[in-house]
Swiss-Prot record:
Residue ranges the record marks as coiled coil: none
Organism ancestry: Bacteria, Pseudomonadati, Pseudomonadota, Gammaproteobacteria, Vibrionales
Top-rank lineage group of the source organism: Bacteria
Pfam family, one: ADI
Pathway: Amino-acid degradation; L-arginine degradation via ADI pathway; carbamoyl phosphate from L-arginine: step 1/2
Keyword set, alphabetical order: Arginine metabolism, Cytoplasm, Hydrolase
UniProt-listed GO biological process terms: arginine catabolic process to ornithine; arginine deiminase pathway
HAMAP family linked: Arg_deiminase
Protein name in the entry: Arginine deiminase
Main localization of the protein described in the UniProt heading: cytoplasm
Length: 407
């Protein structure tokens, strides 16, 4: 049965969307990596091998793995989807009317696989064999990008997030990631896996300009029992939280949203870099950031039209306990001394992916934290991450659950 539903963070994971690192990462250089939101350049072939190990580990846990390149390629085989995506990604406003028309025409003659590779991986002017009467190509240098690469597509968690019976197609904060959402819009609209089955679109499905209403999936934890935990990081705004909450309440998909105000810095760019859900009553936390006194609000529905009540609460931990109906939470902090804990948090020790209650996937390099998880009764399925970890994202960042059981 094809079921598009994510009922928790810790129930049995059944289907997940990944994106294998390929062409886009070959375009990362020391001079452009920061603009493209990376701290370093990766050895792409080695990163691909590590990613394959991640995907295979998921498969050993009876998780169906969908790959973004495959889904987008299959979507582009549908003429209506291909035309929409070319018009959206190669717009007159982005390229100028003459060059946009010429470029769309050239790209439309490519086969589905090649077009997918360029849309995800980027295209330089030196690779574009096109005579144009437009100003733009005449003014650019050969190594300038016609189509910017999207290396952050590696982190499928952020671009869209499935919350109970629907999906949010997230308006991304950073320009380097904003085009990613259109690929997911096309896939969720036209690909047979999604087009043939009903689900709710909460947010981001249309062509609106969302201004300051940004939200990214790394900040959204579907903790279960009708509750959603959202971090207001440097990439998720209060406006984004309220818009998603309003849609969840309007559609009767959630009864409460807990919103935590996070420090706005790189080491905790998303909530899941400092806090993840590992078992019904167990969380991994980096205590240097996730202090007990972080400002926290609880949003609950007022009526059934999306209106809400907003109240500040004294403790996010107590709010989570109430939402889950547990007496107290079991908190596992990052391992090692203060130096080791800071290093391991930076290398995504807290960013684990739970595949079933008490079983998580994480990088093998985080030995101190993994040892603490093991002693606390959490089974860690380790994967290599010396290259993938350079992207500042762990197993949770690199995965978008499509189907997961509740608790």
């Amino acid at each position: 049965m094809n079921r598009l539903y994510v009922g928790s963070e810790v129930g049995q994971l059944r289907r997940v969307l990944l994106n294998r690192p390929e062409r886009a990462l070959t375009h990362l250089t020391p001079s452009n990596c920061h603009e493209l939101l990376f701290d370093d350049v990766l050895a792409v072939e080695a990163a691909g091998v590590e990613h394959d190990a991640f995907a295979n580990t998921l498969r050993t846990q009876d998780v169906e793995v969908l790959l973004l390149h495959d889904l987008l390629e299959e979507t582009l085989a549908i003429p209506e989807a291909r035309q929409w995506l070319l018009n959206t990604q190669i717009s007159d406003f982005r390229f100028g009317p003459t060059f946009a028309r010429e470029l769309r025409h050239a790209l439309n003659h490519l086969d589905d696989h090649h077009l997918t590779t360029l849309l995800l991986g980027g295209l330089a002017f030196s690779e574009l064999h096109l005579e144009s009467d437009s100003m733009l190509p005449k003014m650019r240098q050969p190594l300038d990008f016609v189509i910017e690469p999207l290396p952050n597509h590696l982190f499928t968690r952020d671009t869209s997030c499935w919350v109970y019976g629907g999906v949010s197609l997230n308006p991304m904060m950073k320009p380097a990631r904003q085009r990613e959402t259109n690929h997911l819009r096309a896939i969720y609209r036209w690909h047979p896996i999604f087009a043939q089955h009903p689900f709710i679109h909460y947010f981001g499905i249309d062509d609106l300009h969302y201004d300051n209403a940004n939200i990214e999936g790394g900040d959204v934890l579907v903790i279960g029992k009708g509750a959603v935990l959202i971090g207001m990081s440097e990439r998720t705004s209060p406006q984004g939280v309220e818009n998603l909450a309003a849609a969840l309440f309007k559609h009767g998909q959630a009864s409460k949203v807990i919103a935590i105000n996070l420090p706005k810095h790189r080491s905790c760019m998303h909530l899941d870099t400092v806090m993840t859900h590992m078992d019904v009553d167990t969380f991994s936390v980096y205590p240097e950031v996730m202090r007990k006194d972080l400002p926290t609000w609880r949003l609950t529905p007022k009526g059934n039209n999306g209106d809400m009540r907003v109240e500040q609460v004294p403790s996010y931990l107590h709010a989570i306990e109430q939402a889950l109906g547990v007496d107290y939470l079991k908190i596992i902090t990052t391992g090692g001394n203060s130096y080791e804990a800071e290093r391991e948090q930076w290398n995504d020790a807290n960013n684990v992916l739970t595949v079933k209650p008490g079983v998580v996937i994480g990088y093998e390099r985080n030995v101190y934290t993994n040892e603490k998880y093991d002693k606390a009764g959490i089974k860690v399925l380790t994967i290599p991450g010396n290259e993938l970890g350079r992207g500042r994202g762990g197993a949770r960042c690199m995965s978008c659950p499509i189907e997961r059981d509740g608790i």
